[in-house]
């Protein structure tokens, strides 16, 4: 049986040829080193899969096996890709501190004594990068003490594991400790799919979904389509796993994966590391995918052994043929091929993660588009690229440059993904290499990746270029400056650009000038997938829930501006909606960053009233092309979006938002749905939605509706009033009629579609999913 240890984790000398005779399909194996009460249930999952296969009479993909293996009722569940809603039983829940506040507040209001599913909270989002790791961490602990105390005591009270500030980023902690092949995890962060690199189905959700699972209810997911990505060949030279997903994003665009799971297969999947697979799955969120996953293979065995989980590796090998691999002849809804032999490094951006440019074309493309060629900052790390392998490859480039007397031309920052990675690279020397290079090592946290960056080297409005190994590069996301041209690349390329200071530099063909005045080419990066001397766990930052939880008190000050107990939303009044004003007609990309900004607003994630003051302040108003300036329908005066929404609410007027395509893409933050509900919103009407945001809106009792004819979006004016007709007879698959009343001229009608099923309609009728849950208890 697995047991925890704080000593260095050493990989066995032979990590792949482990005998499996000691384990059988009936063996009892813990899911992780930290919990003694949760076991891997491969046998039950396989039984479910066999039931479904006998019903469907066809081979299954790996992703389908993991989904159907976790069905609540495999005998009677309707199963049709892209159509059915699946009722699933996840193995665990993971929450980061920014989204956990609202999730736990909702869980508390449900009145349930403890979580029914193993769950953890990870403190990674509230630490602002300023001067460096230790000082930034100390400052964050002081500033956020009230929130950390709330989360710590709530976790102790309700039986959740708690990872303290400084422990690392949620996805890296999950990969190191909780992920295992064949599992189903939901997490309140859009990059939860990172764990797909360890053969796990990991899906980002809103806090209300997490509350369902923590409460012991089945979790609902629309049966995804399956996109197969066939990898052939082998990467070499400057190419890294990050380039696979950067290339794929350019092929599919930011919405090409919507409603689908991306499953990787082919001979190429066995040619790189488990952590590299995690990088690829992590950024699958940027193409809208429900999740991404790799099938169980030897690289995963290596990683499990290196992280002290050899028993799980052996147990997975017992089930590899029947459960942890795709069936021969399994069919995908779409297949995309990528030849790793010919893949070159890519740089994606600016302003969107799907604008992919190969390094060989970067200089001419940048010049043609007027992108600033001088690279001001190179940033590596984050949840996407902070593995030991990433760090060693970046360090090898720096050592080569240093041998020629060069240091970083740009500001260079390193965000370690976890305390374990930080401690290991400190022991093995890479950390010193970064510091000698001129790099600033940040806290083990999200930092600049999510806008937690107090950037001082430029003024807001200054046009400049930064290159990171992060996953997302929306306008103003990293530093709050809309003029910053942010590009996403591998850690290797971000490091190269920091050395050269030139976005047009190609390390494959171009030379640098050393301190001696001689030209030289950088050597290809070298690195190792796993530390030869094992991982150093560093400081113990985990708080296990106590055995006696009855005496634990969770205190929320009634005067707090950070935390606020929730009041239930009112149920639907049972009537069609008439003469609703349009709060804003948003034009162009409207991500969750536009809807509910992060950065300085993160501190209000536990206080719905205060954070609602950021609602839609980044969205562009189609009337005037401005952000956060809309006209009050009744007074004619201009004001901010949240102020106008609150004025409508206080005057008793429901309102709607009109949105463009892929509305709500980006993070999983449910505040982007809680805020419009709190401010009196009734419906969000768009050309199309991103999956998580659409579900979050439903959970909070709002109506997410789509134009059946997208051209109707263009016909609506900001000063129109609208009716929503057919709500009293609303049913799955039944359209809603939008009657538009222009300020001048005749009324006209448009057809709106929706994706509600019967139970989701109950959420709307009751006022929220939480209200519906409480009505059943």
Swiss-Prot record:
One of its GO terms (cellular component) is mitochondrial nucleoid. Pathway: Carbohydrate metabolism; tricarboxylic acid cycle; isocitrate from oxaloacetate: step 2/2. [4Fe-4S] cluster binds at residues 383, 446, 449. InterPro entries: Acnase/IPM_dHydase_lsu_aba_1/3, Acoase/IPM_deHydtase_lsu_aba, Aconitase/3IPM_dehydase_swvl, Aconitase/IPM_isomerase, Aconitase_4Fe-4S_BS, Aconitase_4Fe-4S_dom, Aconitase_dom2, Aconitase_mito-like. It is an enzyme of class 4 (lyase). Gene3D superfamilies: Aconitase, Domain 2 (3.40.1060.10), Aconitase, domain 3 (3.30.499.10), Aconitase, domain 4 (3.20.19.10). It catalyses: citrate = D-threo-isocitrate. Substrate binds at residues 96, 189-191, 472, 477, 605, 668-669. SUPFAM superfamilies: Aconitase iron-sulfur domain, LeuD/IlvD-like. It comes from the Eukaryota. It is found in: Mitochondrion. Its cofactor is [4Fe-4S] cluster. Keywords: 4Fe-4S, Iron, Iron-sulfur, Lyase, Metal-binding, Mitochondrion, Transit peptide, Tricarboxylic acid cycle. Signal peptide: none annotated. Binds 1 [4Fe-4S] cluster per subunit. GO terms for biological process: mitochondrial genome maintenance; symbiont-mediated perturbation of host immune response; tricarboxylic acid cycle. Catalyzes the isomerization of citrate to isocitrate via cis-aconitate, a step in the citric acid cycle. PANTHER family: ACONITATE HYDRATASE B, ACONITATE HYDRATASE, MITOCHONDRIAL. Monomer. This is Aconitate hydratase, mitochondrial. The gene is ACO1.
């Amino acid at each position: 049986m697995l047991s925890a240890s704080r000593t260095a984790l050493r990989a066995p000398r032979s990590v792949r040829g482990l005998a499996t005779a000691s384990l059988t399909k009936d063996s009892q194996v813990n899911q992780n080193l930290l919990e003694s009460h949760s076991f891997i249930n491969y046998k039950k999952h396989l039984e479910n899969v066999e039931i479904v296969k006998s019903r469907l009479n066809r081979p299954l993909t790996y992703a389908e096996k993991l989904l159907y293996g976790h069905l609540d009722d495999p005998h009677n569940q309707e199963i049709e890709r892209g159509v059915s809603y699946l009722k699933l039983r996840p193995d665990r829940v993971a929450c980061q501190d920014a989204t956990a506040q609202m999730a736990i507040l909702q869980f508390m209001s449900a009145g349930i004594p403890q979580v029914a599913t193993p769950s953890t909270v990870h403190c990674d989002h509230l630490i602002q990068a300023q001067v460096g790791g230790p000082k930034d961490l100390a400052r964050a602990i002081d500033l956020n003490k009230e929130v950390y105390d709330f989360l710590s005591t709530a976790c102790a009270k309700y039986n959740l594991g708690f990872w303290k500030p400084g422990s690392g980023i949620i996805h890296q902690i999950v990969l190191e400790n909780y992920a295992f092949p064949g599992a189903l995890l939901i997490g309140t962060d859009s990059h939860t799919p990172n764990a797909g690199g360890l053969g796990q189905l990991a899906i980002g959700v809103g806090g209300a979904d997490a509350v369902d699972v923590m409460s012991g209810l089945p979790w609902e997911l629309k049966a995804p389509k399956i996109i197969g990505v066939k990898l052939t060949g082998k990467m070499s030279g400057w190419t890294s796993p990050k380039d696979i997903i950067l290339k794929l994003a350019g092929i599919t665009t930011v919405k090409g994966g919507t409603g689908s799971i991306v499953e990787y297969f082919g001979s190429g999947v066995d040619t790189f590391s488990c952590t590299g697979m995690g990088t690829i799955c992590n950024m699958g969120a940027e193409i809208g995918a429900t999740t991404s996953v790799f099938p169980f293979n030897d690289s995963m065995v290596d990683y499990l052994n290196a992280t002290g989980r050899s028993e799980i590796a052996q147990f997975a090998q017992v089930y590899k043929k029947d459960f942890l691999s795709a069936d021969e002849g399994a069919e995908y809804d779409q297949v995309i091929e990528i030849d790793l032999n010919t893949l070159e490094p890519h740089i994606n951006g600016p302003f969107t993660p799907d604008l992919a440019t190969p390094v060989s074309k970067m200089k001419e493309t940048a010049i043609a588009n007027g992108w600033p060629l001088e690279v001001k900052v190179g940033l590596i790390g984050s949840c996407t690229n902070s593995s030991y392998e990433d760090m060693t490859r970046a360090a090898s480039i720096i050592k080569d440059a240093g041998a020629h007397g060069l240091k970083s031309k740009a500001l260079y920052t390193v965000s370690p993904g976890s305390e374990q990675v930080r401690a290991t690279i400190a022991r093995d020397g890479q950390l010193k290499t970064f510091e000698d290079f001129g790099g600033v090592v940040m806290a083990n946290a999200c930092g600049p990746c999510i806008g937690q960056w107090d950037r001082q080297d430029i003024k807001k409005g200054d046009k400049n270029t930064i290159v990171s190994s992060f996953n997302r590069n929306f306008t103003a996301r990293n530093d709050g400056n809309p003029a910053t041209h942010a590009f996403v690349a591998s850690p290797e390329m971000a490091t190269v650009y920091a050395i050269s200071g030139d976005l047009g530099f190609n390390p494959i063909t171009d030379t640098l000038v050393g301190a001696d005045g001689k030209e030289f080419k950088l050597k290809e990066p070298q690195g190792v997938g796993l530390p030869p001397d094992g991982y150093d766990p560093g400081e113990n930052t985990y708080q296990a829930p106590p055995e006696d939880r009855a005496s634990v008190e969770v205190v929320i000050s009634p005067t707090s501006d950070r935390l606020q107990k929730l009041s239930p939303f009112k149920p639907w009044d049972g009537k069609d909606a008439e003469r609703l004003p349009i709060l804003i007609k948003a034009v162009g990309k409207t991500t969750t960053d536009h809807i509910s900004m992060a950065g300085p607003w993160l501190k209000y994630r536990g206080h719905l009233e205060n954070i609602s003051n950021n609602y839609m302040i980044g969205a562009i108003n189609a009337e005037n092309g401005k952000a956060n300036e809309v006209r009050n329908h009744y007074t004619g005066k201009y004001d901010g979006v949240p102020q106008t929404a609150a004025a409508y609410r206080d005057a008793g007027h429901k309102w709607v938002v009109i949105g463009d395509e892929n509305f709500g893409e980006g993070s999983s933050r449910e505040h982007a749905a809680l805020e419009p509900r709190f401010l009196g919103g009734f419906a969000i009407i768009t050309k199309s939605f991103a999956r998580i945001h659409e579900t979050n809106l439903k959970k909070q009792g709002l109506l997410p509706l789509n134009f059946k004819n997208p051209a109707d979006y263009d016909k609506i004016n900001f000063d129109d009033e609208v009716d929503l007709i057919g709500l009293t007879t609303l049913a799955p698959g039944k359209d809603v009629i939008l009657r538009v009343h222009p300020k001048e001229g005749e009324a006209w009608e448009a057809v709106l579609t929706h994706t509600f099923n019967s139970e989701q309609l109950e959420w709307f009728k009751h006022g929220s999913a939480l209200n519906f849950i409480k009505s059943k208890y």
